[in-house]
Amino acid sequence: MKLSQCTSMNQIIEYYISNQITDTGRSSTNKQSVFYVKDIDKTHTANCIDTAIASMCTLLDKGIESGIIVFTMNISSTKSQTHYIPYSKENGSYILFNYINPTLYHTITTKRLNDGVDEQLTWLVENYERDFNCHVKQTKVYIPSKDICNCLYQFHKENKRISQIDIMTMCQR
């Protein structure tokens, strides 16, 4: 599939991953990488957020300043959800944090697959900002590729599902 043929955010991300990442899980062309996090059982919904945050901080500590974390959450024995979390070190200490597919994020926070998920998410965001000197943003997508940015801009013009300001911010990086 060509980038111009992508018709959804998920397809754009899949294109980005498939064209940037080698079989070893690290990009051979630049430092953008995908890191796979273990499958997480449906009874530990809040822990998947915790795991993603911990993974980002661990990777930053190792000097890997940007990438996409991918993890799957098992909903049942036959169904799972995959989440893509792009992250980047910004201004020395900031991470841009976003669930690319807002529908999946909405599922976690509203269906309450685990008691207290909403409160746990709030706690993690608050403590993450304070303890790690990072600012969690759920309104921006960080994908540092000009082609991807242009494609997202086209997608916005056709679907109006992502903020134009956010896209302009991305494309100016």
Stretch-by-stretch model annotation:
Residues M1-R173:
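A structural boundary/capping signal
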